[in-house]
Amino acid sequence: MSNPLRDARDRRLNRIAGPGALVFFGITGDLARKKLMPAVYDLANRGLLPPNFAIVGFGRRDWTAQDFADQAREWILASARTPFNETVFAQLAAGMRFISGAFDDDGAYEQLAATLDELAESRSTGRNHAFYLSIPPSWFEVVCQKLSEHKLAQDKNPGWERVVIEKPFGHDLASARELNSIVESVFPPDAVFRIDHYLGKETVQNLLALRFGNQMFEPLWNNKYVDHVQITMAEDIGIGGRASYYDGVGAARDVIQNHLLQLLALTAMEEPISFDADHLRSEKEKVLTAVKLPEDLGAASARGQYTSGWQGAEEVVGFLDEEGFNPKSNTETYAAVKLEINTRRWSGVPFYLRAGKRLGRRVTEIAVVFKKAPNLLFTDHEDDEFGQNAFVIRVQPDEGATIRFSSKVPGTQMEIRDVTMDFGYGNAFTESSPEAYERLILDVLLGEPPLFPRHEEVEQSWRILDPFEEYWAALPTQPDPYAPGSWGPESSDELMAKDGRTWRRP
């Protein structure tokens, strides 16, 4: 169904959602309270949702629609990016409904069906429905089957139905395939939106613009000039209250399998024919398919667990001392792996991926490190005085990019030193970047899936990670300890040192 607010001649309004209802399963969870509802409000506040938009919360709380609206106001006041506007909120609240019940309660789904019928009349939703499953994956099958049984999915109505699922997309390749089969047995593949919120970040999308919208980078983006690539996701916090989720998952399953391998795919992919969803996702899938696993998994990986100690001015407890944890747990809070991509462009260029908690600072970045220039003219300088040029894309928190190169130091001597040239979103653009969930929710409502991985991408990611997980699970020892506030265990530094390289200090 076309969007009546979208005029092909008017480029200003080409991303306003049409009529519809967004149904949140698990509306009382942390993600919905802190990210999803504030993002929906921010979209409305920016004029990107129609005035008759509807929101349905589904949860176990015994709430009325007014109770839900009152709670939503508190969540929005606490976490929304844009200023609170009473008129905008009142318009949004008028379309809020709440369904009280368990995820396997047939009566609740009957009430949901009746509510969506009512909204089709009172809010003119056009029977367009997006079901957002902000729930544990163990409930995906039940919810999808109930939606199908109650004719809320694959129904022959004039509108559309889409389903949104959050990571983790399984815990290994077998479970990912099973999950994909379950979801796609109810919803067609093009109606399934797998959320990886990193792909909604401006800097991640800007990576495509930097690579393919400029002439200066792409000629150097290959194994003739690139020495290696480092992709880092560091957090300065511990597991907090996520003990029940994190134990048995670990850093690799939590972020390397999804966020970091997606960043690798975007960094290494060939230029797509267009930004059409199929073209973009096909190029990412080709990269992941070409990832070559190392023969020696131990030499190409490192794991760690943070210990008790001081992080800045704060004394923190170690991972094994966190409440609710098994003191003999083999779950890692830090993981690093070395991968190679078996293509003509990237053959011989290692990609180093690392992620961890309680590290030196919160930062996510992609660093493309170039080979050293020949030291022919500057013969009175030692080779180690010449750094390697690098192009660094900062995903968070200071979104932007940095180029590192050598320059002459002012003075009478020909002395060389590394300097940086910096681009920051906050300095270059007056409008602040929207939150990732704003972009992704809007894309769901518009039916534009380029930023959402297909099941083939998910399965390829697990194909890459599973051998590491199996190798680590067979080790008789726990992951290596590292101090809070450091940059991981010594084994991670040794992983790089074996290749004559070092980790960047973000």
Model-derived regions: residue spans:
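Secretory/organelle targeting and membrane-embedding segments
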Residues: M1-I165, F169-P506
